[in-house]
Amino acid sequence: MSFSVDVLANIAIELQRGIGHQDRFQRLITTLRQVLECDASALLRYDSRQFIPLAIDGLAKDVLGRRFALEGHPRLEAIARAGDVVRFPADSELPDPYDGLIPGQESLKVHACVGLPLFAGQNLIGALTLDGMQPDQFDVFSDEELRLIAALAAGALSNALLIEQLESQNMLPGDAAPFEAVKQTQMIGLSPGMTQLKKEIEIVAASDLNVLISGETGTGKELVAKAIHEASPRAVNPLVYLNCAALPESVAESELFGHVKGAFTGAISNRSGKFEMADNGTLFLDEIGELSLALQAKLLRVLQYGDIQRVGDDRSLRVDVRVLAATNRDLREEVLAGRFRADLFHRLSVFPLSVPPLRERGDDVILLAGYFCEQCRLRLGLSRVVLSAGARNLLQHYRFPGNVRELEHAIHRAVVLARATRSGDEVILEAQHFAFPEVTLPPPEAAAVPVVKQNLREATEAFQRETIRQALAQNHHNWAACARMLETDVANLHRLAKRLGLKD
């Protein structure tokens, strides 16, 4: 079988139609799955000896949250080391990273697998993976045809990464440095709230403004601080962390500003405080609302004038520190109650960021669950850790008062319980492995009884017609997105729509 010019042109056109990188990547993967007639396809980005999924089709949604470290996935390591198409034999002893992650085929092992490394010049930037349930599924495609596919995908990914690099470095195109993969904190989530937060982080990171990060306990405020620091001009200098809630009043000032020998009982030598340690870098003050009013006044002086005094020393030291502060309190309410200084609040909240709670992040809970499942798999030396449909349903309907931290602990506990109930190194997490209190799953909706008389075929077609109409409306008449939502092949969807009179 050979690709026609029309097929290649269709792939190129789909890449251009996309609005933004993510949409282009998804169009590419969906189109490839149709053209190659595979059961699953994925576009992965390579970063620091791990592959990060950017777009998937035919795989469980939690795959987007997983991070595939090379040391834990020998097939992906083989793809990363290869300079060309990699075909794994059907009887390969190397485990497939997607075993158990193809919906409807969880108990079956993937048989056919092809890996296409993607390069920008000599640099490995990603990979395309193609998987099928039939051993000879990709034999009809020559290596040359697959190289053409890889070239199109590599071009799209390389352009996206270069634009990302230019935006993060705020450079003009003429000043662009050669593409280099830079490891940065991964903030997992595609929900509107997280997408907006990532944009705001990109904006404020390039500045030197102080930032106030608010959010409930367990939402990931420290992760936001790390992301800001790593994307800032201060990234080459230290990020120093201080938990204000864990500071006894007697040592809080010394922790922040340092002390000199003899300043108090037990001060047997000079000691630098967190501000000195963070000089030319960033200081992250977690739970800043716990600081006393006296310390708040001294912190305000540092922010205003840039100098500190060690405890027991009359001399001032100049410091150049960017302050990122976090709180789970409503500091406006604290100001009104007289527990937090208004002037300090205004100094810190020049660019406030709010981290959304997990219950408001929709399907992000499944992506994060996939991330934690992969972490557990590596730590415990398991071949695979997958979520059953029942477990996914439970996670999506639990409200998680402890947010991401609670989800992480719940996944770890569930893996331990599931592992204890079955032999072998494969773990499938079921709903009963989670101990969430007061979880009420929505009852199945009762089917409406038709008022008019219809035979079974007419009723089925009416249901299909209405379902497709609603899906098209929700996806702005994008057929590929509609097919993903309905979990069907887009070509089959087109044929069904024509038969139902929805298309000419």
UniProtKB/Swiss-Prot annotation:
SMART domains: AAA, GAF. The keyword NADP does not apply. Pathway: Nitrogen metabolism; nitric oxide reduction. Transmembrane segments: none annotated. One of its GO terms (biological process) is phosphorelay signal transduction system. Residues 187-416 form the Sigma-54 factor interaction domain. GO terms for molecular function: ATP binding; ATP hydrolysis activity; DNA binding; DNA-binding transcription factor activity. The modification 4-aspartylphosphate is found at D57. It comes from the Bacteria. Keywords: ATP-binding, DNA-binding, Nucleotide-binding, Phosphoprotein, Transcription, Transcription regulation. SUPFAM superfamilies: GAF domain-like, Homeodomain-like, P-loop containing nucleoside triphosphate hydrolases. ATP binds at residues 215-222, 278-287. Pfam families: GAF, Sigma54_activat. Residues 479-498 bind DNA. Required for the expression of anaerobic nitric oxide (NO) reductase, acts as a transcriptional activator for at least the norVW operon. Activation also requires sigma-54. PANTHER family: ANAEROBIC NITRIC OXIDE REDUCTASE TRANSCRIPTION REGULATOR NORR, TRANSCRIPTIONAL REGULATORY PROTEIN. This is Anaerobic nitric oxide reductase transcription regulator NorR. It comes from Escherichia coli O8 (strain IAI1).
